[in-house]
Amino acid sequence: MSITKERKQQLIKEYAITENDTGSSAVQCAILTERINNLTEHFKSNHKDHTSRRGLLVLVGRRRRLLNYIKKNSLSEYLDLISKLGIRKVK
């Protein structure tokens, strides 16, 4: 259900702005998206896991707030990020 250390490092390397960037909004969105995708796969076989479903909703809300922040500050970065992550636009 959680992501491995190697996968997290790969996401950081892919979405980082600078070499030592581990906490930028784009990196955080990429990691949250990976966790959301993992939980979505988990629910395909564990549909009664309501506690984790609430955790999923918390993660989706956190990602939505980060995407709104990116959209407010840099629209081009936002559009590039959602196309790379394969998610829809935030309303």
Curated annotation (Swiss-Prot):
The keyword Transmembrane helix does not apply. One of its GO terms (cellular component) is cytosolic small ribosomal subunit. One of its GO terms (biological process) is translation. InterPro entries: Ribosomal_uS15, Ribosomal_uS15_bac-type, uS15_NS1_RNA-bd_sf. Keywords: Ribonucleoprotein, Ribosomal protein, RNA-binding, rRNA-binding. The keyword Cell wall biogenesis/degradation does not apply. It holds the Pfam family Ribosomal_S15. GO terms for molecular function: rRNA binding; structural constituent of ribosome. Part of the 30S ribosomal subunit. Forms a bridge to the 50S subunit in the 70S ribosome, contacting the 23S rRNA. Belongs to the universal ribosomal protein uS15 family. One of the primary rRNA binding proteins, it binds directly to 16S rRNA where it helps nucleate assembly of the platform of the 30S subunit by binding and bridging several RNA helices of the 16S rRNA. Forms an intersubunit bridge (bridge B4) with the 23S rRNA of the 50S subunit in the ribosome. This is Small ribosomal subunit protein uS15. It comes from Rickettsia akari (strain Hartford).
